[in-house]
Each structure stands twice: as C-alpha cells, then as structure tokens.
C-alpha cells in the first residue's frame, strides 16, 4: 500500500508543481513493428527542477488502477471520480489537439488532488524518470549498444530493466503527411485502455523521417533552458 509520503527514492519530500503536455511520439513497442502513442510531458517539481517524461494512455490507466489498489478505503470514490472521467475523455478524443488537452487536464487533476494521493508513492513513481525517458532524452539509442556483444533492440533493454515499453525507432506525427499515412493515425490507441498490453499494428516504410513533431507548446514551454537535477 502506498504511503502518504513517498520515501521510496530521491523524490522524498518533493512533489509535482505543474505539468504540461508538449506533444506526441509514436514509438515501436514490439519486434513486429507495432506502435504506441506516448505523450511528452514537461513536469516542474517543488525544487524548480524540470523533467521531461513519456507516458502512454495505458500508463495513465495503470496509474488509476494503482491508486485504487493503494487506497482501498477510497476505491469506490476513485473509481467514479474525475480520473475515470478524464480517461474516458482522452479515449473519446477524435483529434490530436483535443487528446493532448485532455491528457494535460487529467494530469493537472492528479497533481491537484489532496496530498494523500498527489504525494503518494503511486503518483510520484508515475512522474519519476524511467529508463525509457532517459533513452528518449538522449535521443540516440546507439549509445547503449556497446554494452552488448551483439546488436540488441531497445525493447530487450527495456524489458531487462522491468519495463515492457520500448522503442526501436521514433515515429512522429505531422499533419502534412500523405493521406495514406492519415489512415494509420486513425488507429485508436485507447481501445485496450485498462489492459497491460495493447496492439497497434502498422507497416513502416524504410526512410521514415523523424524530423516532424506534433506540439502543444505555449510560450512558457519554449523557455530555452532546462534545469534538471537528475543528470
């Protein structure tokens, strides 16, 4: 059961002051080329440090489930509260901008909850940087290859660290892409919202250009510096 104060890692006595959703990345999460959408989240902590995280809709669903498990006395309230409504709104969003706004709204709801929840181990662990976040921050997966005798996919490295999420390359979204790819973006990644795994089959072509990127940035997000105590 999660405690009201998180003592599991270096995040003790810290909490998330604000969070914003900057955009979406599509990452390959299996050897078959299945893709999943990850929201890029900018978080500001109580010590003014900033972390950039990547979380999927499935991650948000698991957070909701873990909160209910961690606080069984409040299970019915959490099950019918704003978190559930927020997840449904994200799932039903029909365009990228609406989805980004709904994710941001849900995250702000979470960090605005009573300290019992917002500073619990469950929530702070969700906002802690993961190995996947570190790989995407470096934006160069080849840096970790020399640690292995033979070529290895990021998926294998992530699983060895206890993560089932991974990427072998970064696929990003742009509104100017050909119509053929528009059909690919129509896949709803929220169909299996409350399941641990979900499938997003798609066929990738060689030479995909990862330069395009869908953003949800305001002036505040464009501040040209980052304070990060985790480096």
From Swiss-Prot:
Ranges for domain PX: 1-134
Annotated GO MF terms: phosphatidylinositol binding
Gene3D superfamilies, sorted: Phox-like domain (3.30.1520.10)
PANTHER family given in the database record: PX DOMAIN-CONTAINING PROTEIN 1
Identification of the protein by name: PX domain-containing protein 1
Organism whose genome encodes this protein: Homo sapiens
Organism ancestry: Eukaryota, Metazoa, Chordata, Craniata, Vertebrata
Gene field: PXDC1
């Amino acid at each position: 059961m999660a405690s009201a104060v998180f003592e599991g890692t270096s995040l003790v006595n810290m909490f998330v002051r604000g969070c914003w959703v900057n955009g979406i990345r599509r990452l390959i999460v299996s050897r078959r080329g299945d893709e999943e959408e990850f929201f890029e989240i900018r978080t500001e902590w109580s010590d003014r440090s900033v972390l950039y995280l990547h979380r999927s809709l499935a991650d948000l669903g698991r957070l909701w489930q873990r909160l209910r498990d961690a606080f069984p006395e409040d299970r019915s309230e959490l099950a019918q509260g704003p978190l559930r409504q927020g997840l449904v709104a994200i799932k039903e969003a029909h365009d990228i901008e609406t989805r980004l706004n709904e994710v941001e709204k849900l995250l702000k709801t979470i960090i605005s909850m009573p300290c019992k929840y917002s500073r619990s181990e469950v929530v702070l662990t969700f906002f802690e940087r993961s190995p996947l976040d570190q790989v995407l921050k470096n934006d160069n997966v080849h840096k970790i290859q020399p640690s292995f005798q033979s070529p290895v996919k990021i998926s294998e490295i992530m699983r060895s660290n206890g993560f089932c999420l991974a990427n072998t390359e970064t696929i990003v979204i742009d509104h100017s892409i050909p119509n053929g790819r528009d059909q690919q973006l129509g896949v709803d990644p929220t169909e299996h919202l409350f399941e641990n795994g979900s499938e997003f089959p798609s066929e990738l072509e060689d030479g995909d250009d990862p330069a395009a990127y869908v953003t949800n940035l305001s002036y505040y997000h464009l501040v040209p510096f980052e304070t990060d105590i985790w480096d």
